[in-house]
Amino acid sequence: MKNDHYVFNFYFFRSKITSNHLIRLNTNYLKKTILFISSDIPETIYEKFYLQSFKLFIIYYNINL
């Protein structure tokens, strides 16, 4: 799974986002990983966290396992 690319399937309301919401995508289709997260960035994407507000940031993040 090294260097695979993922994107969050997230919802526009206050609910927890976990690794269960990650969807594996074709690396040829998606060159970079787009993570939709709150202003508080977790240490790892597998760490459970909650949306602090509706103001979200788009972060390009390469996942290396």
Swiss-Prot record:
Primary site of residence: plastid
Keyword match Plastid: yes
Location(s) in or outside the cell: Plastid, Chloroplast
GO cellular component, one term: chloroplast
Superkingdom of origin: Eukaryota
Protein keywords: Chloroplast, Plastid
Record's protein name: Uncharacterized 8.1 kDa protein
Organism whose genome encodes this protein: Guillardia theta
